[in-house]
């Protein structure tokens, strides 16, 4: 499979997830190509690099992420935001440790677009020293977050404990102006692997995983 390619087969959708799934399916390849070329969706230009801590702005006294910026945490995880200040990508080499949680940020991330059964999901888990703040959080279905996503994190943690390196690239995909991703593309390498492994999750119970 070519690097970054996505294959989806045999998944049946109904109800409120159908529209979001269709929009996501149509846009994933464009999204990946845009990010790999250094662009930010909706601008045609690359993100502006800022120092970690400078990725925030204030809107009516509320902290938000700046649009079209790139920031790197002290742990070495690099993120970009899109033209609407949503986390558009994150990547880095994982390291085991204890990140600090922000329970308030986890409860409110996504605002009005958040669903009742969502968690504040960490793109880089706290067990990998991921930030507990909005710069590393998205609204994520709780069953996905605690199920298939957690299984993947456990696979990475086990590899690190075995002495292997783990590198990840995570791309949330959004529809319209929503701050809630409707799907995720996750690519990762373990050890000295040449090719990226690929996981696709839809932001629904069970992740509707296609492999």
Give residue spans per PLM region.
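Low-complexity, glycine/serine/proline-rich disordered segments
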Residues: 1-89, 99-102, 106, 110-112, ...
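Domain-level detector of nuclease and nuclease-like folds
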Residues: 69-211
């Amino acid at each position: 499979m070519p690097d970054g390619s996505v294959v989806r087969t045999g998944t049946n959708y109904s109800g409120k997830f159908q529209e979001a799934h269709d929009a996501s399916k149509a846009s994933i390849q464009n999204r990946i190509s845009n990010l790999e070329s250094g662009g930010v969706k909706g601008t045609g230009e690359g993100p502006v690099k800022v120092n970690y801590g400078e990725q925030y702005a204030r809107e009516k006294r509320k902290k938000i992420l700046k649009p079209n910026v790139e920031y790197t945490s002290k742990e070495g995880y690099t993120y970009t935001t899109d033209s609407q200040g949503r986390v558009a990508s994150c990547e880095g080499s994982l390291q085991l440790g204890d990140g600090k949680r922000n329970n308030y940020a986890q409860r409110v991330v996504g605002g009005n677009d958040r669903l009742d059964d969502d968690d504040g999901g960490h793109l880089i888990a706290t067990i990998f020293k991921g930030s507990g703040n909005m710069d590393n959080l998205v609204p994520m279905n709780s069953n996905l977050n605690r199920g298939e996503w957690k299984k993947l994190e456990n696979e990475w943690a086990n590899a690190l404990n075995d002495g292997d390196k783990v590198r990840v690239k995570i791309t949330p995909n959004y529809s319209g102006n929503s701050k809630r991703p409707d799907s995720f593309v996750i690519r990762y390498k373990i050890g000295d692997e040449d090719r990226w492994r690929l996981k696709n999750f839809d932001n629904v119970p069970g992740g509707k995983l296609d492999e």
